[in-house]
Regions:
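Active-site-proximal specificity loops/subdomain of glycosyltransferases
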Residues: 36-65
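Short, charged, surface-exposed secondary-structure boundary motifs
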Residues: 19, 44-47, 104-110
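GT-A fold catalytic core of metal-dependent nucleotide-sugar glycosyltransferases
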Residues: 54-108
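N-proximal low-complexity "stem/linker" segments adjacent to membrane-targeting elements
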Residues: 1-16
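Conserved catalytic core of nucleotide-sugar-dependent glycosyltransferases
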Residues: 88-149
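Short, acidic, metal-binding catalytic loop of nucleotide-sugar glycosyltransferases
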Residues: 24-32
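Short amphipathic alpha-helix
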Residues: 20-25, 57
Length: 251
């Protein structure tokens, strides 16, 4: 069976991030297959032509992936060390959505400020940024539900506790799909290594969402250090121009 990493990247900023992510993957896993899915590669075309945030296209990753087994990663991430052993842990599952995040100290985070929608609706704590799936009936059904959530968000929202102006995000759509299909079929909460360092303001105690303005960091060829701490888990840096520093460090 073929296996590889897939990165969804629509728009120049995300393509730049995806290229940096691909380079970081190949640096620590030289034999890894990596595919960047750009707008022209979407099997159903761009479903959000008038928006910068192309969340509505995410469900197309199932058909767009050229692999039998896929680990989908968000574009604005960095992989600091090999995660090739994940394949052995995940291979017996059809689908696993990450449910764990960490702060820059590498500690599992229990900050819930960004998860009010999840908590108010008793939904699984899904983080779409790292998702494993196998070409299977389970994964196909999952992404059909994700598509349905985006296309019929107003109907879903009418049954949920949320702000009337709440928009459908990929995490919300994944959480709903995980709930419908069952956590036992869609997540692996005990595999906490399948997690990311989430560089959001309140998770890391920074004054603003731009952590690069307040934290000291180093981008070295073999690691990224933040406040002198080496980052050992996938780093979701989210400040898009940080990709330039990653690219320069991996030349």
């Amino acid at each position: 069976m073929t296996k590889g990493f897939v990165i969804m990247a629509q728009g120049d900023d995300y393509v730049k991030c995806a290229e940096a992510l691909k380079r970081s993957i190949k640096f620590v896993m030289p034999d890894a297959n990596v595919t960047i899915i750009t707008t022209d590669m979407l099997p159903y075309g761009d479903q959000a032509p008038d928006t910068y945030w192309k969340l509505q296209n995410d469900w197309q990753v199932y058909e767009a992936s050229p692999y039998d087994e896929t680990i989908k990663l968000e574009a604005d991430m960095y992989i600091p060390r090999s995660i090739s052993h994940w394949w052995d842990v995940l291979k017996d599952r059809d689908l696993v959505v990450s449910s764990t995040i960490r702060n820059f100290k590498q500690e599992i985070s229990d900050v819930r400020l960004y998860r009010r929608f999840i908590d108010d609706n008793n939904l699984p704590d899904a983080y779409n940024a790292i998702t494993y799936f196998k070409k299977s009936d389970t994964a196909k059904r999952f992404y059909e539900i994700v598509r349905d959530v985006f296309e019929n968000w107003e109907d879903y929202k009418a049954t949920l506790k949320c702000n009337p102006q709440e928009i459908a995000t990929t995490d919300w759509a994944y959480a709903i799909a995980c709930h419908i299909m069952g956590v036992e079929n869609t997540m692996l909460p005990t595999f906490t290594e399948m997690s990311m360092v989430h560089m959001k303001q309140y998770i890391n105690g920074t004054p603003t969402e731009n952590w690069t303005d307040s934290f000291v960091y180093e981008c070295l060829p073999n690691q990224v250090r933040i406040q002198t701490i080496p980052q050992r888990y996938p780093l979701h840096y989210h400040v898009k121009n940080f990709s330039d520093k990653i690219m320069k460090s991996l030349i």
